[in-house]
Amino acid sequence: MNRVIFCELKTTARMKIGIDALAYYVPQQYLPIEALAQARNIEYAKLHKGLGLTSMSFPDVDEDAASMGANAVLNLFNAEQLDPSHVGRLYLGTESALDSAKPTATYILDLVEQQLAGEYGSDCLRNVDAVDMTFACIGAVDALENACLYVRQNPEKKAIIVASDLAKYHLGSTGEYTQGAGAVAIAVAVDPSIISLGDEIGVATKGERDFFKPRRTHTKAELLVEAAALLGQELSMEEAEIKVTSAEGFWGGNRILRSYVEEPVFDGQYSNFAYISRISEALDHFGTKVNINPALDWDKVVMHLPYAFQGRRMLVNFYLDWMQANGKWQDVVSVMGSDKPADKSEAKEWVRAFSKSDYYRSYVAKALAPAERASSLIGNMYTASIFMGLLSTLCDAADKGEAMEGQTVGFMGYGSGSKAKVFQGTVEAGWAKVGQLNLFTALENRSAVDFKTYELWHNERLTAPLSPEKSGFTFTGLRTEENQEYFRDYTFTA
């Protein structure tokens, strides 16, 4: 009888579900944006004042999505003294996965389980479900949604999501100055201490080609021709084809060689258009479910930030629409001294002028700037960007002694390819514990590297770690044994 009643309550009772704890990991080294600007002959003010960039994190040669994610998850277990038996899910959002079949989440789970074994047993995470979720920068938002659904069905359990990524672009590209890296881990639970999340989500999805990481293909004959030229020899494509056809070992077998690199194929302007379009559609969808006006109802806005000022630059037109909808358009007209022109070109200049007004800047300072603070110092974290924005917002409020309980946070996630999700949450009474993570102190204590060192790292020419004495999980190498080739090994340093 009691069992039946319990099951009924699990599926029908309304309960608060959301973020109960947060933890993070950011690499110890960074490149000052000023150094990159000087090397690339870019005006520093355009990057710093225009895009909000100050520095960008990048992983050491012995760090990757698994080690960074495992460090964030272990930090979460330790800080919260989580009992592994209370955890039922480990979902990873990433676009820096290490394998096409083996989930990177299983590397993370195994590493964390090894460190918890002494207290909880060697199989303490054996009954935890783990999976990777990949949809460009929105994968961890998908993970959060699924984690909430799991906890709603299993209120006695917690779910952990982790976002871990490296944003790496080709040297000299327009994406180079937006690079970044790191991981954020989140515990999702009933009666959360930090933020309770609403049930409704606005979503918009459309297949786009704005940003992707394909498997590149090269014929071995092409590579052989290039190798011959490097050695000062001439070799025709026909001759190369004959040689590789009869070759053994590397040059034999398949005619085509497939490779993968972290640097994406991307179109910045197209991606920005897709971002704006999907967010607009997701906001409309959310509005059919929840009667809100973001300009009035969202105290803070946390969104995916490819660069720190993306939100403030993108949202100005949305903000103007919200002001028209909430009956405050006359305030805007008074600030500008005129209504928005009908002429498209004049209207564009009018909007640009409004974006620089004290009126809009006061909104940015209140709602958007707190999330920008960490992004400016770290760079783009792909899936972790939106959650680092949340962490930044809460830590900023804790530093300033701001009363956050009861405030509404609006979330806008985006992933190229493309998809956007819009949802909201309410800050709960225990939110201030996030201040104990000392995010901004940790970011101040990182080590800067010079541009030459950064280029060596980017081209994978560094042979030793930049920070050899770091604590936590690190990558130690690839196995060479038969049937284990390229399996990744890690170690832990206390």
Where do the language-model regions lie?
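Conserved beta-ketoacyl condensing-enzyme motif
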Residues: 19, 65-141, 294-318
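C-terminal catalytic subdomain
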Residues: 344-353, 361-437, 441-444
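Acidic, glycine-rich active-site loops and adjacent beta-strand->loop/helix elements
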Residues: 23-25, 93-99, 134-140, 163-168, ...
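Buried hydrophobic packing segments
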Residues: 69-76, 108, 143-150, 282-286, ...
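Conserved catalytic cysteine-centered active-site region
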Residues: 45-67, 97-158, 164, 322-385
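Flexible, glycine-rich active-site loops centered on histidine and acidic residues
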Residues: 155-186, 191
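Phosphate/pyrophosphate-binding loops at sites that engage ATP/ADP/AMP, CoA/4′-phosphopantetheine
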Residues: 72-88, 280-297, 316-321, 325, ...
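Condensing-enzyme catalytic core mediating Claisen C-C bond formation in acyl metabolism
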Residues: 6-62, 176-277, 281-284, 418-494
